[in-house]
Regions:
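Aromatic-rich, lipid-facing transmembrane alpha helices and their immediate juxtamembrane interface loops
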Residues: 1-182
């Protein structure tokens, strides 16, 4: 595993715990600040950083829409709100940054079925862990809730990684791109 992949993993974990534990302990601003710092460092290491920023912004919007829908339909609950709060939105670009070139999950844009499987398993696991740590509440039927989240993430994760391949790295898989890379 490369140093960039290890740093990608560390950024993912640090951002996730800052968002979830910050929200659970009454510091909902903490996670977005940590994620913003981590993403700033991430973007600084990417070729085509303007495209990366654009893509991370798209991912944040997608995350806001998805989580707001889950909240509005009662799949998830966060007391006092029916729209996705900033700490929950921040988790989306934090996760998707690991699919960038050199990142922990950089092979996902070339493997949409693996991306779907990761979404189907990892999404529910993350939401369940967030609920166990007190940041969110799951709907009244835990297994149904996790199944819904799994289906949503099984669709959204491969869609986002395929979008990454189109928006950020349209030539990432050609030999000319690899030769031009430092």
């Amino acid at each position: 595993m490369s140093v960039r992949a290890v740093l990608s993993f560390m950024g993912l974990q640090l951002g996730w715990f800052a968002c979830v534990l910050g929200a659970a302990r009454g510091y909902p601003w903490l996670g977005p600040v940590v994620v913003l710092v981590a993403l700033s460092m991430h973007v600084g290491k990417q070729r085509g950083s303007a495209r990366e920023i654009f893509f991370l912004g798209i991912t944040a919007v997608v995350g806001f829409v998805v989580d707001t829908a889950l909240l509005r339909f009662g799949v998830l609950r966060i007391p006092g709100t029916t729209i996705s709060p900033p700490w929950l939105v921040a988790l989306w670009p934090n996760f998707i940054s690991t699919t960038a070139e050199g990142g922990l999950l950089s092979s996902l844009p070339r493997r949409p079925l693996l991306a779907s499987l990761l979404g189907a398993v990892g999404g529910p696991a993350a939401y369940d862990a967030g609920a166990r740590l007190g940041a969110i509440e799951l709907g009244s039927h835990r297994l149904v809730t996790l199944a819904i989240v799994g289906v949503v993430w099984a669709v959204v994760v491969p869609a986002l990684v395929l979008l990454r391949a189109r928006v950020v790295t349209p030539f990432a898989h050609t030999s000319a791109y690899r030769q031009a890379a430092p």
